[in-house]
Amino acid sequence: MPNSITTGLPLLDRLLYQKGWAKREMVLFMGFAKSGKSTAMGEFSINATLAGYNVLYLSLEVHTTILSDRFDARLSETEMSKLVERRDEVHRKLAELGATKGIGSLWVVERPSGSMSPADLDRMLNSMKANGMVPDMVVVDYADLMRASYDLRDDRANIRSIYTDLRALYDKHNVAGITASQTNREGGASEVATMMHAADNIEKVRIADLVITINKTEEEEAKGEARLYFAGSRNQQGGISIRVKQNLEQMRFIERILDVT
């Protein structure tokens, strides 16, 4: 029996070793600036919640008010630019969803960049559990903006420590873990970013159980398309490329899967 959380996309679930985001493991999305990393993590958090799972979303970059608007846009399938003028319709759709049985909880916590360590997150999870709030998935947006639990006085060593401790935390609390990191300039210019394009420290991609890069040419971006590339995996075949249709105005990272190669 797979020990995983659905992605919300049956085809993507089938491509994953545990038929979803595996518990006790870390998935790392990598992409250049503004490639949609936060949108991806938001979408998969919502999909898990709609499937009945509880999700903790820790934001170290985007304010909760903006995240709330993004989640409202995604859930109501409304363009971000039209949330205000269509607020009555949005509220109606959200109320209908809220009345649906079997929906999980999505807890969103905002902290300043550099203020939260894996040890702090561990204490937060312990406190949540003591109050009956038990997440199935923990999303960190994103790990590069955490601080090390113990300052090693070396940036590369601190990054390695953050990812090692975060991966251990996902294991300890039996949750599916998702985070993201930025590719370097070369990765942003490449048609397909690989593990070698990790910014700051390649050790982070060695620690992650699954590394998925977000890729799009200018032509693909104009068509609302992107490619997800399985750049590295501990438990399954790598090198898989998934071409997807997006609707980023509605915060839909994957509207549908176009093909898999």
Residue ranges and their predicted role:
Residues 40, 44:
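Hydrophobic positions on the alpha1 helix immediately C-terminal to the Walker A/P-loop
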